Amino acid sequence: MDANKEKALQAALQQIDRQFGKGTVMRMGDKELEAIPAVSTGSLGLDVALGIGGLPKGRIVEIYGPESSGKTTLTLQVIAEAQRKGGTCAFVDAEHALDPIYAAKLGVNVDDLIVSQPDTGEQALEVADMLVRSGAIDVLVVDSVAALTPKAEIEGEMGDHHVGLQARLMSQALRKITGNIKNANCLAIFINQIRMKIGVMFGNPETTTGGNALKFYSSVRLDIRRIGSVKDGDEVIGSETRVKVVKNKVAPPFKQTEFQILYGTGINRLGEVIDYGVKLGLIDKAGAWYSYNGDKIGQGKNNAIQYLREHSDVAQTLEDRLKAELLGQSFDEAVEAEAESE
C-alpha cells in the first residue's frame, strides 16, 4: 500500500479505537483464526452433519418442522448437553407447554434451568435480550416464534386484522439481539412452526412463521421431520427422525442425518454410536454378534447398546474415536476438545 494511504488508514483506525473502543475494527491477519465453539446436539450424526461437532455458540439457530416432529426434544437435548459441560441455560416458553418431568427424563437439570413464561411477544423477546446481555447464559431457547403474540393482538378483538405485526416484531428484535448474542458467545435457538402458503401451484408451499428476518439472521437452520415409528414388537416406543441442515454459515450446508427419538429417554445416541462404529469398521459385526477390540459386546443391537450403557468409559472412547474420524481431527484433538469443554 502507498505510504500516504497507510498513514491515513492508521490515523483512521486509531480514531475509531479512541471513539468506539479497542477491537472495533481489526485486520483479519492480526488475530489467529479460531475454531467456532459448539454445543453438542445429543445426536452424533447431527453433530457430524453440522460440520463443527454441534450448534455454533454466539450465533442464532432456527429449528422448524411439523407438529410432534421432535423440535422441543432436540432443544432440550442441547440444553442437557450444555448443562453437562457446566453451562447455564434459559428457556423462554412462549407456548406455555414445557413439561419439566419430560425435560428431566432427557437429562436436563430442571432445578438449574431458567424458565420464563411471558404474556406477550414483546415481553418474551425483551426477557431473552436481557438474559443474553447478562453474559451469563450459554444456551437460550425460544419456544416458539409462532407463539410470540404481539401485545396489540392480545389486547385487540378476536376478529381484528394485524397485518405483519409479528414479522415487524421479529425483525426489530433480531436487529437488536444479534450483536448481543455474538458478544455474549451465547447459542440462541428459535423453534418455529410450519404454515402453508395459499395458492402455490409449483414448488414447496411450506413456510415458517414470523416473516423472513429469522431466515436471514440464522447461521444454522434445521428442518426436522418424523419419518416413521420405532417398534418393540407391536408397541411403538419412539420415532424415526430425519434432520436436514437447510442453511449453514459455519460449514458446508445441505447435509442430512437420521436418528431415533425414544419416548421418555430422548435421542438414541448409543444406537448411533454402534451404527457409525460398524460403518467405519471400529465395531465388528458377525451375524447378530457385535465385537469391539476383539471382545464380544452383545448379540443383537439392543444388547450391544446395553453393554455400552453399562460400560460408559468404553462408550466414551468409542465416541471420541468416531468423532475424530468423522470430523477430520486427530483422536488426541478429539479427547482434548472433550476435556476442555468439561
From Swiss-Prot:
GO molecular function, one term: ATP hydrolysis activity
Binding sites annotated in the UniProt record for ATP: G65, P66, E67, S68, S69, G70, K71, T72
Classification via InterPro entries: AAA+_ATPase, DNA_recomb/repair_RecA, DNA_recomb/repair_RecA_CS, P-loop_NTPase, RecA-like_C, RecA-like_N, RecA_ATP-bd, RecA_C_sf
GO biological process, one term: DNA recombination
Pfam families: RecA, RecA_C
Chief location: cytoplasm
Subcellular localization, as worded in the UniProt entry: Cytoplasm
Family recorded in the similarity comment: Belongs to the RecA family.
PANTHER family noted in UniProt: MITOCHONDRIAL DNA REPAIR PROTEIN RECA HOMOLOG-RELATED, RECA
Annotated function: Can catalyze the hydrolysis of ATP in the presence of single-stranded DNA, the ATP-dependent uptake of single-stranded DNA by duplex DNA, and the ATP-dependent hybridization of homologous single-stranded DNAs. It interacts with LexA causing its activation and leading to its autocatalytic cleavage.
Protein name in UniProt: Protein RecA
